[in-house]
């Protein structure tokens, strides 16, 4: 029917998994036209960006997408160009978005583009864990307001080194729910990584605008205070860096300044922020330089003083460099605190509830047993989530927060 042929699509880079999915669809009388043996990170048939209301995936853990993996470089990353395939896709009415997607992939295959370069968080990288790229892939596939569910290792949710990923996703989708799975969930598949189910909803256009407005307001409220800290740090270090904390250098520089020639440390500048995640722009500090002009009648004296000052400064260059390094370290600490303050304020302005659960049983044992005899808290969990959804729809008033019951241990 229409649901199977026009609404359900699936892809897997493991041929056996793809065949099993196709057979399952056939056995349920749903056909299998949308199921493909293909790399899930690449478009195929009706699978392309911005098309789906719902995406579900369980990406492989412990593997990486490397820069050596190219579009069209293997059977599962091929880009079909045969006339029958093109005609079939056009007859299904995928329209301009599909045409543009297929054109991009053909260009990528012709130029042997690394798969990583198709993704913002992969572009220019030597490798990325597969599950991280799948987070971006799923969000790309969704329409604005579309929902996704993904199984992720818990390290993605709490490892400090992956804070950038969480912040990246936070700026593109709302976190709906996190369900921490018990350790035995994947033991029968020889997976030892603790995992969780993560549910996200891609921003609508209105939510994207609200997110950007929150950042604009946060910058308005926060930036000036941290700029003052940068100015104070500069004022504290500048004379010491310029003179290398040497008394003779300080004296000579003072005499030159009286004649109109100064040795100065330039004001700090804002650098270029990385593409992701959002953060305060890094502070850039240049090296000392000479500034000013000496009157003609003082040039001979100034030339001699400058020669002496230059020689003296050369002797304390290491100290000056060390002080400059200290100042840059201070700037880095200010930048990090600035970023933390921005994120804290944005999260206050763009605050919303998240459903979190940690069931002890999910219908599977450590040996892979399933069925009616295996305990599962998931039905009760679903009921609780429906209550949570209803509460959100009613305005999420604190006084009406659902009082979820303890899960049954039976």
Where are these regions (language model features)?
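Conserved SAM-binding motif I beta-strand of class I
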Residues: 8-12
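Conserved hydrophobic residues forming the short capping helix/wall of the S-adenosyl-L-methionine
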Residues: 25
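Residues at the starts of beta-strands that form the adenosine-phosphate
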Residues: 5-7, 147
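Short alpha-helix immediately C-terminal to the canonical SAM-binding loop
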Residues: 16-20
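A conserved structural/catalytic subdomain of Rossmann-like adenosyl-cofactor enzymes
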Residues: 49-410
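Short loop/turn elements that flank and shape the SAM/SAH-binding pocket of Class I
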Residues: 41-45
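Conserved SAM-binding strand-loop segment of SAM-dependent methyltransferases
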Residues: 31-40
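Conserved SAM-binding loop of SAM-dependent methyltransferases across substrates and taxa
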Residues: 1-3
